[in-house]
Amino acid sequence: MAGTLPVPLHVELPQGWESAPPDKVGAPHAAFVGLHKASQGQGFTPNITVTGRTHEGSASLHGLAEESVQRLRENVGSVDIAKRTEVGTSTAPGLVDAPGIVQNLRIQADVNGQPMELAQSQFILLIQNEQQRGELVEIEVALTAKTSQLDAVLGDFQDFLAALRPADPTQEG
């Protein structure tokens, strides 16, 4: 069953991307998955996933980033952290006050029986749940692509992040 987000978010896929049911593309815990249409059928389709979960009290961004890497290691295999940087979210309207962290990862994975080198760029942020006082919401947005595909889709990922914002209560995802 596909995951849900603890807070509603408005997402806009860049041109050339399409949403896909998380369960059908092997991302059952994701609340949202976008696929790069032009790359389908090339052994690996670059994808953007959005997941979320709640935390009572406080949470450390670096701790959350480490947990994400550990989950990947348990589920996929070898993961190396290429870069990790704390960031503000001023480029994402509506999420300006939320602290965030970006980490770029190199992943050695087995995809359809073939060894593959993947790159993943994760943006992890913490926001206050306006509906639940004292509750923090972790949102993880990740772009995953073959290292050879990364340059072609990284700009789209940045556009996706720039458009990400809390949903208007009258809007849907």
Task: List the predicted regions and their residue ranges.
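Surface-exposed amphipathic alpha-helical segments
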Residues: 17, 137-173
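Preference for bulky hydrophobic residues occupying beta-strand positions
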Residues: 11, 104-109, 141-143
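A generic structural signal for short coil/turn motifs at secondary-structure boundaries
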Residues: 56-59, 112, 148-152
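Short, solvent-exposed aromatic-acidic interface loops
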Residues: 51-55, 71, 140-148
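Signature of long, low-cysteine stretches enriched in small and polar/charged residues
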Residues: 65-130, 158, 171
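Secretory pathway targeting signatures of secreted, lumenal, and periplasmic proteins
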Residues: 1-70
